[in-house]
């Protein structure tokens, strides 16, 4: 929490100063009210009138400060929330492929939405409120001290009580807050799963399952929030009662002081208001300190800050000789190996195919080459250097991976191909031609600027794969790994794409296919046929 407050210190400081000044002026209004009362008791009309005008001006200043505080607080919260999401994104980028896929995308979505909302409610808003409440307490105590020193003493004692009592409950709220965060992430993931399966459930008439699933996930989320709220508010109510008892004690002290002529009668009205402000402020500080404890689990999830712990900045050397797979074994489960003592060699500029039934390790091999699955036995050499010496990010500077299930961003075809980079018209035309996408664009009125829809649902499966191939080609990756990347294409377009890839002398191609004709096999330098849990040589 402190990290983000410091990061956005200009707007945080401006909002805090406005809040402090506003609450300080509110205490001044109580002192002015004491003087107004004294003017009435003395029958001094002039003093009464002047104090009334002063009171109105003071309240005007309070309102102006609060308006300014709202402006600066809104900017500060926006910047801190943006910083939170940047750090969450940086944390995801620092995960390995395996680490990232250990969690559902719904859980990550929950962090970017629910977690940020919870932090805003339990950390940012309470922080600014505490600044005002603390100012109210400090200025109130100073005002009470100016009236009589005994009021200062009792105020300090009560302040200590109100500060230390909430600490008794911080651990409990931290535990409840952690459970709430986990429940929300799980619920969002379940709702996302139901939304993704909407068509399947409707097709089989499972409307009730959709409704009940959403209801169950929603209730789980709300139950966790309810438990957190009950704990927070229950503790807050207890603290409010302690504050009320303290306030009554001060009223009793005021009565004793007035009855003994130690302070004027006029002070009773204003002093009561100041005391109420002090104890309400203390109560607020206590309750909000508890809120900070509940927000801690959300901050604990953020372990990386954007701009820190940068990845290695040196690039991957251009492939000179080739990639060698030596005696590689791998299994997601130790008892069920997928690859056993694999040996393969992929020369620079060569064209290779991997064939075999499902589950024999074809896709697994590509992911090992990409550095996504480092837990294998044996060696994978990139020009005689172990690929473990490189990060996946470095390997992907020279490699591109096209899989059967293509993901497209909800933007235009152009943006999905270029990913925001600038390319010449010649580069674009070549990528469109070599990917067999040019023919599709000719039938689209908006051409490259055609929106693809959410997850590319405005395009056919074959069109999406052609966009993915064009994306890989235009970014000039010299090593292309294709995992059934032409499976959704008709035979004519598949032939066009594969012919273009096979004819490119600068491209090292490793292509997965379940079925290859003898004619097509002859066009590859080597075809590796895999069988489940076997070796290839």
Labelled PLM ranges:
Residues 405, 413-416, 450-537:
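ABC-family ATPase nucleotide-binding domain "signature/switch" substructure
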Residues 206, 230, 274-305, 314:
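Cytosolic ends of transmembrane helices, especially the final helix of ABC transmembrane type-1 domains
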Residues 93-138:
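Juxtamembrane loop-to-helix connectors within ABC transporter transmembrane domains
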Residues 6, 97-98, 114-123, 127, ...:
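An intracellular "coupling" helix at the cytosolic face of ABC transporter transmembrane type-1 domains
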Residues 370:
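Helix-to-loop junction immediately C-terminal to a conserved catalytic motif
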Residues 7, 11-24, 55, 62, ...:
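Transmembrane helices of ABC transporter permease
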Residues 86, 379-381, 389, 396, ...:
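ABC ATPase nucleotide-binding domain helical subdomain, centered on the C-loop/LSGGQ "ABC signature"
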Residues 10-29, 40-82, 266, 270:
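Transmembrane-helix motif of ABC transporter permease domains
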